[in-house]
Design a protein with these regions (language model features):
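Gly/Ser-rich "nucleophile elbow"/oxyanion-hole loop immediately N-terminal to the catalytic nucleophile
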Residues: 4-41, 56
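Short beta-strand immediately N-terminal to the catalytic nucleophile in serine-hydrolase-like folds
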Residues: 36-38, 63, 88
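Extracellular/periplasmic catalytic domains that process cell-envelope and extracellular macromolecules
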Residues: 28-29, 52, 78-81
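A conserved short beta-strand
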Residues: 55-67
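Short glycine-enriched nucleophile-adjacent loop
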Residues: 43-54
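Residue-level signal for short, function-critical loop segments
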Residues: 40, 66, 91
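C-terminal catalytic histidine-bearing segment of alpha/beta-hydrolase fold enzymes
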Residues: 86-88, 94-148
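Alpha-helical scaffolding within the catalytic cores
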Residues: 66-78, 99, 103
Length: 148
């Protein structure tokens, strides 16, 4: 079926909101600890969806994602201010060069986001599963209390 694209309608964000609503209705979910992450195009989607003003996600963790500074420029200033974002990218990434991650770090930091940046010298365009624990630790410590 259809899915999101930078140039098309975002059909996935409403579905994610429905899933989160369902999960929250059936299990205990900390409203101050809702992580949106993804790798490659999924990481790019975490920027696109997670920077929306009404996004229910409190923390973003894109990995090996494409980024255009326009995303930060178009982001709602209040949403961006203080938003914890953990960027992970491989220095050897052949699909989305590491300069994209550096640009994301710089643009999002300039917009007021609380950016944590991790560049891995020996990583190409691969998800660094060994960092899952570190990302969860970061989320536990990166405060976003009381803000959506």
């Amino acid at each position: 079926g259809s899915t999101w694209s930078l140039s098309g309608d975002d059909v996935d964000t409403p579905h994610l909101a429905q899933i989160l609503e369902f999960v929250s209705a059936h299990w205990r979910v900390d409203p101050n600890r809702r992580l949106l992450t993804g790798m490659s195009d999924g990481g790019t989607f975490s920027y696109v969806s997670g920077l929306e003003p009404a996004s229910p996600f409190t923390h973003l963790a894109p990995s090996c994602a494409a980024f255009h500074p326009m995303l930060a420029q178009m982001a709602d200033a209040e949403r961006l201010r203080g938003l914890p974002i953990h960027i992970t990218h491989g220095a050897l990434d052949w699909m989305f060069p590491v300069e994209m991650a550096r640009a994301a770090r710089d643009a999002l930091s300039a917009g007021g986001a609380k950016v944590s940046y991790r560049e891995l010298d020996d990583l190409s365009h691969v998800y660094p599963a060994e960092l899952n624990g570190a990302i969860l630790d970061w989320m536990a410590l990166a405060d976003r209390s009381g803000r959506r």
